[in-house]
């Protein structure tokens, strides 16, 4: 469910041009018990000038299923169900668009002018899905100027920072709901990781216009995953050491 109250304000947040202006709703997917990630997201959002009094900003209590069913893991199923419910609510509310963030999203330190150019142009162009954060690099593509959007038809992992426009929301909801009714391995798409489902949706609907931010404005934070479970995150003591290493890596390298 979506929490009714906006997130609390952070004292001393510097004024800045909001990166997220122009979206009807901004949702952060967060497991209630992952208070560490919520705190990190509060810092990240304040860094880009998000107004904590803005009623468009919501924290979504991520799903925690008790059975994984045909999904790769409990976390994968919970992630899928969370994104689907957020989109169902967006459809019911007849939103013009929605920006969805996962709670391991870190915003990059690109110049404010680049971020402003991307935001301004997004809302004056034609698009269905827009990935503000993605793993695709344009460093070796001289034709891609910083601050531009790039049409993309290829597949990639990650769904930590993406937007969906109004006309694509019903089609995406219908596609995802169909996946929940199919068996694993179904040729049209069965239970799978959510980012894989987005890839299949775009492959089966080539008219859907997907744009990637050039450059990517957000990457996934190095932290314990609730979706991809690692053996070292399950061992007491060792998991704390790994967490310290991740925190040190983030401090040193961002």
Segment roles from a protein language model:
Residues 1-101, 105-254:
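An acidic/histidine-cluster motif and surrounding catalytic segment
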């Amino acid at each position: 469910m979506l929490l009714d109250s906006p997130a609390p304000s952070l004292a001393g947040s510097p004024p800045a041009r909001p990166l997220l202006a122009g979206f009807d709703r901004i949702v952060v997917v967060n497991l209630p018990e992952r208070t560490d990630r919520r705190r990190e997201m509060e810092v990240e959002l304040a860094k880009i000038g998000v107004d904590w009094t803005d009623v468009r900003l919501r924290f979504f209590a991520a799903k925690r299923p008790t059975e994984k069913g045909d999904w790769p893991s409990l976390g994968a199923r919970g992630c899928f169900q969370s994104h689907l419910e957020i989109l169902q609510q967006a459809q019911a509310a007849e939103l013009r668009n929605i920006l969805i963030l996962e709670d391991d999203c870190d915003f990059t330190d690109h110049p404010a002018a680049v971020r402003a150019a991307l935001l301004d142009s997004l809302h004056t162009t034609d698009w269905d899905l827009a990935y503000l954060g993605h793993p695709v690099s344009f460093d070796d593509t001289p034709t891609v100027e910083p601050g531009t959007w790039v049409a993309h038809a290829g597949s990639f992992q990650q769904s930590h920072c993406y937007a969906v426009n109004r006309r694509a929301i019903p089609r995406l909801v219908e596609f995802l709901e169909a996946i929940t009714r199919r068996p694993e391995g179904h040729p049209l798409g069965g239970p799978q990781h959510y980012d894989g489902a987005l890839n299949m949706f775009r492959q089966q609907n080539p008219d859907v216009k997907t744009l990637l931010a050039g450059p990517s404005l957000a990457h996934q934070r190095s932290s314990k995953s609730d979706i991809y479970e690692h053996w070292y995150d399950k061992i007491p003591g060792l998991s704390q050491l790994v967490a310290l290493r991740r925190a040190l890596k983030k401090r040193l390298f961002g």
